Amino acid sequence: MKIAIAQLYTKNLDDWAYIAVENKKRYARLNNYDLVSKRGLYKTKPKRHPSWHSLSLILEILETSNIDWVFWSDVDALIMDYTVKLESFMKPNCDIIIPSQGQGEYCGIKTNNCLCCGHYFIKNTQWSKDFLRHLWKWPKDEYDRYRNYGYWEQCGMNYMFNENEMDFDKHVYIEPKNRAFNSFYYQEPDKQAMEFSQWGEGWFRTKESEKGLEKDLGTAYNEGDFIVHFAGKHCIPQRKKLMQEYSEKIKWN
């Protein structure tokens, strides 16, 4: 089985993106995976937020290589446990494996599962390629604003899920444990003041979600988790420092 890790970033992230590139390069080399790190965007009309370009990169890999699976990984994340194999998350009868952040209202849609595009697996099948094209075409008419607003392609992914577009439920496995491969870095308010409204994800940072940590649920990074994801406005001022710090904590064996 051939697996590729894919990530994309723009030059304004150069100050710290190299840390993630090196982190995943070492992990890929150790586990015999390919790594595709693209710096820059594809030409699109009209213009879209860089997050949308992840779809173009994944589709390019699927169409031009013999890769069996692509693991998309946002560039603001680090792999913390090099002993964990990507194969351990595979579901052979699925085309996409994507984690759920939990229940809440997302992009104006009430949902029992908010799917997160920060990290997910996609299999090299015709359905997957058709789905990526379909998702790319989604932001039009009343959804046109999501080309550059909100959570971009993730809003589209959740729309596809809630509307069961392209028989979504028959092709996609929803990983109930977001922390399986997408743990968010989070500091308690007494350590660093933060308003949840700044990045709109307060509903999965509630006291109720903290109870789920005992069952490996919830979304916040805990020591020993596979990946730490430095997403959100609260991370922006300290992202480079955090990534340098956590790069020294990787489990190699």
Predicted segments with their positions:
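N-terminal anchoring/stem segment of glycosyltransferases
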Residues: M1-I67, Q126, N253
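A residue-level signal for conserved active-site and pocket-lining positions in enzyme catalytic cores
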Residues: I5, A28, I58, D76, ...
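Short beta-strand/turn micro-motifs composed of small residues
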Residues: Q7-Y9, I98, H229
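Short, solvent-exposed loop/turn segments at secondary-structure junctions
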Residues: T10-N12, Y42-K43, A77-L78, G102-E105, ...
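Aromatic-acidic/polar surface patches that form glycan- and anion
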Residues: L13-A17, K47-S51, I109-N113, F121-N124, ...
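The feature represents the membrane-entry module of six-transmembrane cation channels
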Residues: Y18-A20, K25-R29, Y33, K38, ...
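GT-A fold catalytic core of metal-dependent nucleotide-sugar glycosyltransferases
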Residues: K47-L132
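Catalytic core and acceptor-binding pocket of nucleotide-sugar-dependent glycosyltransferases
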Residues: S56, W127-N253
